[in-house]
Regions:
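Active-site mouth loops of central-metabolism enzymes
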Residues: 1-8, 69-79, 149-150, 154-155, ...
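Short, acidic/polar
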Residues: 4-18, 80-91, 156-169, 232-245
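Aromatic-lined substrate-binding rim segments of carbohydrate-active enzymes
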Residues: 9-69, 120-150, 168-169, 190-205, ...
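Glycoside hydrolase catalytic-domain groove-lining segments
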Residues: 12, 147, 156-228, 271-279, ...
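Aromatic-lined carbohydrate-recognition surfaces of secreted/lumenal glycan-active proteins
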Residues: 54-56, 100-102, 125-164, 178, ...
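Surface-exposed, active-site-proximal loop segments in enzymatic domains
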Residues: 59-79, 109-120, 266-271
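Active-site groove signature of glycoside hydrolases
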Residues: 72, 82-126, 171, 178-180, ...
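Substrate-binding cleft of secreted/luminal carbohydrate-active enzymes
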Residues: 99, 215-288
Length: 289
């Protein structure tokens, strides 16, 4: 389960575990206090859950400040913060609930220098492959015991863009979360509601062809974000899950998101148990069956 908020009751963790969820991840990271992060990890550990933690996907890991979201200085680009990242990892790595370290969300598209923030320099302000190679090396230097996780999305059905090919060829990640959200909107229209049925297997197989040993988890939409993502329906969620599990090369399925998400690039009061109880029921039933 992705996008799990930092300040939740223990029952949420218990409910996820009881439903069959094994691993959770967050949208928050190094902007939070270490004490808060450890408390979250304690909750997960108590419920028997593992956590994918920020190891470099957050804006702080790339040298950005809160004010950059409101007004990015002209020409400011991502700069990897080795000391900050390794300090964060060293403060948390002894916790047994940590499953992996997440070093990238869509090549920085969701950073202040990214397309999601309306940066006019995009895609020139994209995180580079050399930076991701350095990020991987530095995270593994601090904690060589856990795998590296990265997030990416599929484009049009066809060749991957060069930066995605380079990520796979350089084995940046040990686990890839492939974000295929069928509820994506543009101009108030769903753009590709059948993306998983149409191209899910293609994307997974293309990833495995370039990096055979990588684990691929498909991330499926179970949320709403006004003007960008239409509320997932129970029917579309059932369809997406059914199509995903047909893909033989797929190693796992995840869902975005539990919520709430309160980050600079995405503020949402979406909270799956209350905002999408019908979707949570679908997820639980599908895992059970």
């Amino acid at each position: 389960m992705k996008g799990v908020g930092i300040d939740l009751p223990q029952q949420d963790f218990i409910d996820m575990k009881d439903a069959g969820i094994e691993v959770i991840s967050t949208e928050w990271g190094m902007e939070q206090r270490v004490g808060m992060a450890r408390a979250f990890l304690d909750q997960a550990q108590s419920a028997g859950l593992k956590v994918i933690m920020d190891g470099g996907f957050s804006s702080r890991a790339w040298g950005f400040t809160d004010s950059d979201w409101q007004r990015l200085p002209e020409g400011k680009r991502p700069v990897w913060q080795k000391e900050r990242v390794q300090g964060w990892i060293n403060a948390l790595k002894d916790h047994p609930a940590i499953y992996a370290w997440d070093i990238s969300n869509e090549f920085g598209e969701n950073l202040p220098s990214g397309a999601g923030a309306g940066c006019p320099d995009w895609p020139n302000s994209r995180i580079t492959i050399e930076q991701l190679k350095q990020a991987r090396a530095d995270v593994l230097e601090a904690d060589p015991t856990r795998p590296i996780h990265a997030r990416m999305y599929g484009g049009d059905k066809g060749e991957f863009p060069d930066h995605v090919k380079a990520m796979l060829d350089n084995k940046i990640a040990d686990i890839i979360s492939l974000n295929l959200y069928s509820n994506y909107l543009a101009n108030n229209k769903l753009q590709w509601p059948t993306v998983i049925a149409d191209a899910g297997a293609f994307f997974v197989n293309a990833i495995k062809k370039r990096q055979p040993e990588v684990k691929v988890w498909m991330s499926i939409s179970a949320f709403e974000y006004p003007k960008q993502f239409q509320r997932t329906t129970a029917a579309s969620l059932e369809r997406d899950i059914d199509e995903a599990v047909k893909i033989q090369e797929l190693d796992g399925v995840s869902f975005f998101c539990w919520g709430p998400v309160d980050q600079w690039d995405m503020k949402s009061d979406w909270y799956l148990p209350k905002s999408g109880p019908d979707l949570w029921t679908v997820i639980k039933n599908k895992i059970k069956n």
